[in-house]
Amino acid sequence: MAKGKQPAAATTYTHWLVKAEPESRIEKGVDVKFSIDDLERVKVSSWEGVRNHQANSYLRDQMKKDHLCLFYASNCKVPGVTGIAKVVKEGYPDHNAWDPKHPYYDPKSDPDKPRWYMVDVEFVSKLPHPVPLSLLQQLSTLSPSPSSSSTLPESLSYLSPTFLSSLSDSTLLRRGRLSVQPCEEGFFEGVREMGERGGWEDWEWKKAAGAKKGVKGKRAKKEVEEVEEEDVDGEKGGEEGEKEAMGRRSKRAKKA
């Protein structure tokens, strides 16, 4: 008798992308901005305020000590990856959800039955060449083959076909609204290498991207930008839902 199919093993991730807002925004009298410079200054910070169930499950169950994270600047003029962080404390209850005065207060969470979790991350490095989201979007349109290198400037010849092929399948480009998301090691290393080496500054990739996109491309870009995908009791649609998401999508710096 033929053996039954074994259930597929759950994917285990060791690399992540976490989003924070680098520009000032006041919520309940608190400036919720948090940039890679802020993390460098405080060295270690809790990653609190996540109010999306999928992202929360990553924080609670899957992000482990020494896992590396791409630090992503969100909701700013040039969104993209600006640095590297490392998990130094695994998931524990986000106590800010119990504080009515806190920007990320949730009346349905309590100490006896925590609803939201956070991890602690440590500053690793600031990338000398921040990697724009729009550049990754443009690179994802290239054919993932050796011949694709002919469309790139010599200064970007270090980008491998494997990395280029990983872009279109990356969570960042498929489910860009998640503020905490897993990424494959190849994607992580490729983006980190870009941030360390640069090479696109003189490439007219923005012009090429604009010529291809049109209305459809602009709509697609909007979909991956830039708000955390909130789903506290389900995501609301329309203007009301957008306002609610806007109120919770940031990362707040700890007081020094």
List each model region and its residues:
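GIY-YIG nuclease signature motif recognition
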Residues: 18, 85-86, 184
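Intrinsically disordered, low-complexity, charge-biased tails
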Residues: 1-5, 213-256
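Eukaryote-biased feature marking scaffold/signaling PDZ-domain proteins and nuclear chromatin regulators
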Residues: 13, 64, 80-82, 114-116
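Aromatic- and Lys/Arg-enriched surface recognition patch
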Residues: 84-178
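Mature catalytic domains of secreted/periplasmic carbohydrate-active enzymes
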Residues: 7, 142, 148-161, 165-172, ...
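Short, charged beta-turn/beta-strand-edge "cap" motif at the junction between a beta-strand
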Residues: 72-79
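Compositionally biased, charged N-terminal/linker segments
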Residues: 1-65, 198-201, 206-210, 216-219, ...
